[in-house]
Amino acid sequence: MSETETLVTIARDDSVGTITMNDAQRRNALSKELIEGLVNAIGELQDAKARAIVLRAQPGTRTWSSGHNVRELPTTGRDPLAYSDPLRLLVRRIQACPAPVIAMVEGGVWGGACEVVMSCDFAVASEDATFAITPARMGVPYNIVGTLNLMHSANIPLVKEMLFCGKQVGAIRANQVGIVNYVVPPGELEQQTYKLAREIAENSPLVIALLKEEVRVLSAASPLSPETFERIQGLRRAVYDSEDYQEGIKAFFEKRAPRFQGK
């Protein structure tokens, strides 16, 4: 069995599929290998005609996912969150899957993992779940598509608070602003998640696939002009070429607070 296969497991109960992240040692960091396993698992369940897919971590985990594997971020002036970045591939795969994907969330959700949850069609969270987006704390230039995905899931004031401050947001507040659909006691998380999955699976899969694609296309129907896109990309290039970007990654590995100089 390959490492990718051990990092991600797949189960199926009738027309409901389950994908479990199993890299507890690295707190389910979104490494290239883990994401490859998730993408392949979605494809396998799609081929098996699953009508709903539950994406989860190990039962009782304290961290649903710690976000990007910082060790894989480039340090040579290359865009760390380009179009072909594994996280971007995973988000697009979830969005393109005709079966609704439900994030079953317990524990902390960090960095890019927040976008993974928000890219799912539904999120059911335990009362003790928390969400934090931390690129500003590390000097990492977040991707413009990723920011747009966040804005589709939550109101702009909260998106700014999460991006600018990097503070944790609890499950109840996340529910109030639309990041998660349901908040339940920890002991009821699995029951409520699979109840929702079965309700979806009982409906017409063709209609649901159509509706999911319609929502995806319409929610992305505000294109940027080429000039605006290039201007934003220029700002991002300035960040990942900066001393602050190098300092953020260095501070992470040295387990200290970064000393950003704005240059």
Annotate each language-model stretch with its function.
Residues 1-5, 250-263:
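Terminal low-complexity tails and localization/encapsulation signals of metabolic enzymes
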Residues 1-58, 92:
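Conserved CoA-thioester-binding segment of acyl-CoA-metabolizing enzymes
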Residues 47-48, 57-93, 109, 139, ...:
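Glycine- (often His-adjacent) and acidic-residue-rich active-site loop
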Residues 62, 92-142, 168:
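Glycine-rich beta-to-alpha active-site loop
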Residues 122, 161, 165-167, 173, ...:
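Well-ordered beta-strand positions
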Residues 124-129, 180-230, 259-263:
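C-terminal long alpha-helix characteristic of the crotonase
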Residues 147-157:
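Hydrophobic, secondary-structure "cap" segments at the distal end of domains
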